[in-house]
């Protein structure tokens, strides 16, 4: 086992030997040919979208991990895509909403278990406004949505640790502004 929740490689992709092991220095190395493979974090985006009551838009996950639990809208950044483009694409795909403004807030590391493998992600969090909330429609990876006051949401209903951490951050920053 390694940091990914499974044995990632059985054989070295360069020489084919069975000596391809995960090192304590966070990469895979073949003890036969010396090939090194670095498996870095994947980037993901998260949107904080509020309604006129300042409630935060939470989605309901339609797939595992954490199927049926609360999440914040967003998703993985595709290869060759900017975080900003991924943010706009994911919000359109999941909720049929068009972003008209966004502001970077913070990052949050995450472990995303899927298919027997643990993906390490870095979630880039943005405060967003949309052109028209009336166009909202759950789609793609989202089975539903709810607007909830960030101070009233039960963090036990949130499926991913990084999202719970983001909610805690929002609570703390809003409390300090009062």
Residue ranges with predicted function:
Residues 5-9, 26, 43:
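Short metal-coordination and nucleic-acid-contact micro-motifs, chiefly zinc-binding Cys/His arrays
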Residues 12-15, 30-33:
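Short cysteine-rich clusters marking metal-coordination/redox-active sites
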Residues 20-21, 38:
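Short functional micro-motifs and their immediate structural scaffolds
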Residues 21-27:
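Short linker/helix segments within small regulatory modules
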Residues 106-134:
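Active-site-adjacent beta-strand/loop module that shapes the phosphate/pyrophosphate-binding cleft
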Residues 137-167:
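NUDIX/MutT-family hydrolases
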């Amino acid at each position: 086992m390694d940091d990914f929740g499974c044995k990632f490689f059985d054989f070295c992709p360069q020489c084919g030997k069975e000596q391809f092991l995960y090192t304590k220095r966070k990469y895979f190395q073949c003890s036969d040919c010396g090939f090194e493979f670095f498996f870095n974090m994947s980037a993901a985006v998260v949107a904080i979208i509020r309604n006129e009551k300042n409630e935060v838009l939470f989605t309901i996950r339609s797939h595992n991990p954490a199927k049926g639990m609360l999440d914040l809208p967003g998703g993985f950044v595709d290869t060759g895509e900017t975080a900003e483009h991924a943010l706009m694409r994911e919000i359109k795909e999941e909720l049929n909403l068009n972003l008209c403004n966004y502001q970077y807030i913070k990052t949050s590391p995450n472990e995303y278990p899927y298919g027997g493998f643990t993906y390490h992600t870095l979630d880039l969090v943005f405060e967003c406004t949309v052109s028209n909330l009336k166009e909202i429609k759950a789609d793609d990876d989202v089975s539903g949505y709810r607007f909830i006051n960030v101070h009233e949401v039960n963090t036990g209903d949130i499926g991913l640790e990084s999202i719970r951490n983001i909610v805690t951050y929002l609570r703390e920053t809003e409390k300090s502004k009062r």
